[in-house]
Design a protein with these regions (language model features):
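Short glycine/proline- and aromatic-enriched beta-strand/turn motifs that initiate or cap beta-hairpins
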Residues: 2-54
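Short loop/turn motifs that connect adjacent beta-strands in outer-membrane beta-barrel proteins
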Residues: 4-15, 59-60, 100-110, 143-146, ...
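Predominantly the C-terminal beta-signal and adjacent terminal strand-loop region
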Residues: 6-7, 142-212
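Residues that define the transmembrane beta-barrel architecture of outer-membrane proteins
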Residues: 14, 43-49, 85-91, 109, ...
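Transmembrane beta-strands of outer-membrane beta-barrel proteins
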Residues: 16-20, 63-65, 91, 109-115, ...
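Residues on the lipid-exposed face of transmembrane beta-strands in outer-membrane beta-barrel proteins
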Residues: 20-22, 51-55, 93-99, 115-119, ...
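Outer-membrane beta-barrel translocator domains and adjoining extracellular loop/strand segments
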Residues: 30-37, 75-82, 123-131, 161-168
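Gram-negative (and chloroplast) outer-membrane scaffold detector with strong preference
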Residues: 55-130
Length: 212
């Protein structure tokens, strides 16, 4: 089967991606039993609170750094308990794989998965700083040129002295805007213009010399 040219390494779909989004944290301690209990379990600020930078490598692989801010409120469940509040900050480094090539030439749909490691600070948790193993699933919807919408769900497994600590597990969801920087083509076109200008200049000089 024929593959897209960028998949074969001739052209990259982008060089960098940046994004800003809203994030919601589900830390109710119920694993995935009630993943969409927004009213009782989801903590989310009203303003965009997550940033992302993605560097494309090759063959659908990229490296992503993300940071997020949130705030726990006393009316939400935290490890099956209410009355807890405090600051939440997460930082993550993930390796991402895009399935964009499977849907080519449908350029607007870009699903991906990613794995990585992170650190999470939670005032509401007994051990304020924990490590986590990230398992992420997301979608980019390219709606206008290099602009798109990104939807992502992350399962974060807490890493503690006991390696995996279920009390430190949580889910994080995000929805926001992304922009991709593609490789510039101006260098080649400028060279062609320079070549044409030099060639015409040589002709002009030659004609002038002949008249003398």
């Amino acid at each position: 089967l024929a593959q897209p040219t960028w998949w074969m390494g001739q052209k990259k779909p982008y060089k960098w991606q940046v994004g800003i989004s809203w994030n919601a944290v589900d830390d109710d301690g119920r694993d995935v039993c009630q993943p969409f209990d927004v009213k009782q379990s989801w903590n989310y600020p009203l303003f965009p609170s997550r940033i992302m930078v993605d560097r494309y490598l090759k063959k659908g692989l990229s490296l992503e750094f993300a940071g997020a801010y949130n705030n726990y409120t006393t009316d939400k469940l935290v490890n099956d308990t209410t009355g807890l509040s405090g600051l939440f900050i997460s930082t993550d480094l993930n390796t991402k794989f895009s399935f964009y090539q499977l849907f080519y030439p449908m350029k607007w749909f870009d699903p991906y998965v990613s794995l990585g490691l992170g650190l999470t600070h939670r005032d509401a948790y007994s051990q304020t700083v924990t490590g986590n193993l990230n398992i992420n699933v997301g979608f980019n919807f390219w709606i206008y040129r290099n602009w798109g919408l990104q939807l992502q769900t992350s399962g974060k497994l807490g890493i503690n002295g006991q390696f995996f600590n279920t009390n430190a597990d949580y889910m994080q969801h995000s929805l926001g805007v992304v922009y991709k920087f593609t490789e510039s083509r101006s260098h080649g076109s400028s060279n062609r213009k320079k070549y044409k200008w030099t060639k015409s200049r040589q002709k002009y000089r030659g004609g002038k010399k002949g008249k003398g």
